[in-house]
Every structure is written in C-alpha cells, then in structure tokens.
Regions:
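Compositionally biased terminal segments of proteins
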Residues: 1-149
Length: 149
C-alpha cells in the first residue's frame, strides 16, 4: 500500500469524525492512492452512512470543525446523492451520501481500517472501490481501474 500524507486540515476533520463515531469511508483519489495507484487529487472524498443517528454525528463534527451552525442541518446528510463541499482544492473536503454501484453498509462491513500517524481511517476495500469506479464510469475512473492491482 502506498504511503499517504495528509494535510493538517484533513487530519483534524478525520479526528473529529472518529471522536463523534461517524460511520464513514474514505473513497475517491485517496482510496485509489492507498490501494496502490498514487495520483494527484484536488480533494478528499468521504462517504457517510445516510441515517438519522449518523446525520447527528456528522453535523456535530462539521460544527466542531468550524462550520457555522446555521449552515449545517442534520437533514442535509439524509439527502440522496448529496455532496457537501468545504475548502478549496487541493485542500477540499467532499462529503457524499451516495456512491455509484455500491451499498454503504455492505462496503462498511468490508472496510480496511488503516492507521496514518495517530489516526485510524476507514478506507473502502479494493474490491468495493473497483465496483464503485466501474459503476461511475468517468474517464478518470476508468484510468484508475487500469492502474489498480
């Protein structure tokens, strides 16, 4: 697996997700890099379980991270196909509620928990990442598939 360097803001946010017991998976470019194809990415993609209990936890994590209370509603994290963006590339966080071709709970049961520095991070498994990339089907997803083991 590739060595991953995280921006301090990403570390802080991941620590908050863990401290609030948020059910999440790291997907996208960071997951591709972890699974063996390091490449440039402009953001960190975090897929969350879209449930009542998890929406309360993720909203609390966002507030603790500094998002104004009035801009973060728990219902925001219950919407299908929602993308919540924070920051500017290359230090942008994208929290998503849906991922193409895969089910969150199934993927969560297959997750790989990896320690980077002092942070335990939930990564989508290689098999589930490949399913997701295949279903998404964008040019960069196909390129990722060609380079993943």
């Amino acid at each position: 697996m590739a060595r991953i360097e995280l921006h301090p803001d990403f570390k802080d946010f991941l620590r908050l997700l863990n401290s609030h017991n948020v059910k999440y998976l790291l997907v996208g470019g960071y997951a591709v890099g972890y699974h063996g194809y390091p490449r440039a990415t402009g953001d960190m993609d975090i897929w969350i379980e879209s449930s009542e209990s998890n929406s309360k936890k993720i909203a609390a994590a966002f507030r603790d991270f500094g998002m104004p209370h009035e801009t973060i509603s728990e219902s925001l994290f219950l919407e299908k196909d929602k993308v919540i963006r924070m920051g500017i590339p290359p230090v942008r966080l994208e929290v998503i509620t849906t991922a193409s071709g895969v089910d969150f709970n199934e993927c969560y049961s297959h997750r790989e928990v990896i320690k980077i520095g002092d942070i335990l991070i939930n990564f989508i498994s290689l098999q589930d990442l490949k399913k997701n990339k295949h279903a998404a089907g964008r040019h960069k997803d196909i390129a990722d598939l060609e380079h993943l083991p």
